Design a protein with these regions (language model features):
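Beta-propeller domain segments
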Residues: 1-97, 129, 135-138
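Small/polar loops that bind or transfer phosphate-bearing groups
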Residues: 76, 103, 122
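Conserved blade-ending motifs and adjacent loop-strand segments that build the rim/top face
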Residues: 94-115
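Blade-level signature of beta-propeller repeat domains, shared across WD40, Kelch, NHL, RCC1
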Residues: 112-143
């Protein structure tokens, strides 16, 4: 995601359109809103889309000291799928080289990387717990 780029929502979508009761007064008619080609509408094309939507909550970049094999990876929190997603881009950030679903079992409301302690902290919605993904164990602890 780049600053000042328009990815088209809610006019253009790779997934389902949710237009019931939606009226923002823009110049696009409802018939134009389900248009799949972002570029033809003047929007930036995403390099990857979660279809169906996973309900992205937070995206964090993992710094070098977390785990060598996860160096410069991103973690994506999800409300819909109850998974954490690990994503590795190519060097130019033009395509995804690797993507992994990590089962958490709860909706991830928020996600933060604690570089001082080399851990990822997740606010879990269903139980109100904190989930911690630690550098050494790579397992999720619920508190």
């Amino acid at each position: 995601i780049y600053k000042d780029k328009n990815y088209g929502w809610p006019i253009s979508s790779d997934g389902n359109m949710y237009v019931d009761g939606y009226n923002d007064g823009d110049e696009y008619s409802l018939s134009q809103r389900n248009y799949k080609d972002h570029e033809d509408m003047g929007f930036e094309n995403p390099i990857f889309s979660f279809i169906p939507s996973i309900g992205i909550t937070e995206i964090v970049e993992l710094e070098d000291e977390f785990i060598e094999t996860w160096k410069n990876n991103f973690l994506v929190g999800s409300l819909n799928s109850k998974h954490l997603y690990r994503i590795k881009f190519d060097k130019e950030f033009k395509k995804i080289n690797y993507y992994e679903k990590i089962f958490v079992g709860e909706r991830i409301r928020d996600l933060k990387y604690d570089s001082r302690n080399s851990q990822v902290i997740m606010a879990l919605e269903d139980s109100g717990s904190l989930g911690i993904l630690k550098k050494k164990s790579i397992k999720i602890n619920l508190f």
